[in-house]
Curated annotation (Swiss-Prot):
Homodimer. Produced by lymphocytes activated by specific antigens or mitogens. IFN-gamma, in addition to having antiviral activity, has important immunoregulatory functions. It is a potent activator of macrophages, it has antiproliferative effects on transformed cells and it can potentiate the antiviral and antitumor effects of the type I interferons. Glycans are attached at residues 42, 61. Belongs to the type II (or gamma) interferon family. The keyword Isomerase does not apply. The gene is IFNG. It holds the Pfam family IFN-gamma. This is Interferon gamma. It comes from Phasianus colchicus colchicus (Black-necked pheasant). It is found in: Secreted.
């Protein structure tokens, strides 16, 4: 319950962060609804501050816009899961859930990306078969690191050609 109550603050941050891009969000109403949700969870309880933030800290490590969209997709999914266990008959919970679903539909599906990262972390790099496959793929991986994406390459080439 402590994690859930503190997460409500992060929910506010996410809603506000996407508020400037999603014109349909009514931030004043959402803030009021989130305040009601905080009251539902008694988030003013002293244990909420214990241990510091649990989600906002994770966002600091994700600096690029596309990276943030991946992690925010996961965070929005967590909030939707949290709200599944609440009284959906309350108008403020229903409204927050609807807005989160709208945001989720506008974010990339981060689940597959997270699964890919987890799968990579599980690879046993001391296994000879895995080492053979990895060695076989190393040059391709390095090429992806060195080569700029084709759209950036085309744009930079056209900028170099122009003698304006």
């Amino acid at each position: 319950m402590t994690c859930q109550t503190y997460n409500l603050f992060v929910l506010s941050v996410i809603m506000i962060y996407y508020g400037h891009t999603a014109s349909s969000l009514n931030l004043v109403q959402l803030q009021d609804d989130i305040d009601k949700l905080k009251a539902d969870f008694n988030s003013s309880h002293s244990d909420v501050a214990d241990g510091g933030p649990i989600i906002v800290e994770k966002l600091k490590n994700w600096t690029e816009r596309n990276e943030k969209r991946i992690i925010l997709s996961q965070i929005v999914s967590m909030y939707l899961e949290m709200l599944e266990n609440t009284d959906k008959s309350k108008p403020h919970i229903k409204h927050i859930s609807e807005e989160l679903y709208t945001l989720k539909n506008n974010l990339p599906d981060g689940v597959k990306k997270v699964k890919d990262i987890m799968d990579l972390a599980k690879l046993r790099m001391n296994d000879l078969r895995i080492q053979r496959k990895a060695a076989n793929e190393l040059f391709s991986v390095l090429q992806k690191l060195v080569d700029p994406p084709s759209s950036k390459r085309k744009r930079s080439q056209s900028q170099r050609k122009c003698n304006c």
